[in-house]
Amino acid sequence: MAFDFKKECKELYRPASKPSIITVPPMSYVAVRGKGDPNTEGGEYQNALPLLYGIAYTVKMSKKGSRSIEGYFDFVVPPLEGFWWQESPSGDIDYVRKDDFNFISCIRLPDFVTRDDFDWAVAEATAKKKLDFSAVELLKVDEGLCVQCMHTGPYDNEPATVGAMNEYTTEQGYVPDFSDTRFHHEIYLSDPRKCAPEKLKTVVRHPIKRAE
């Protein structure tokens, strides 16, 4: 059986529909940075997706190729994720100003993937898929203390979920802790091409710290 991060790490990928506090461990990602409305056809976000999946599946399928990755185990490619921010002192997201989005779009990689393995995957994917993978990077993220919640419904309805998260954060004696390294985080458990908007499931996660 292939290792499924969603099933084995339910605290990270299957939170309740009510907010909760969690300490997220360090993780590795294949990532692409960009700007702009994620819904724009041919935009930076849309162009990032085949690059991310190209690397993730190259690593997964390495078992059938010439590269032997130390510590390799078969795995289900984890869900697409995104770190989002706008130029705002508060760190709040304005869902109307989609053109002002900055993003890091990413897919989690197993811990066995080293820099050499990643560089091999980039070269292998470039040769086989005939795409320009120069924008991808191996990203290490240590999110640490966060509040998170399962959001069900359209992405544009997330402010209600974020409001509940903010209220819970305050009640528990914490405050938001957005910075140039800590962002609004979304994990996409549903494929919007195949799922009705009202049934979309998205993990929403925000960095927090103890109130002083």
Indicate where each model-derived feature is located:
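A solvent-exposed interaction/effector surface
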Residues: M1-E212
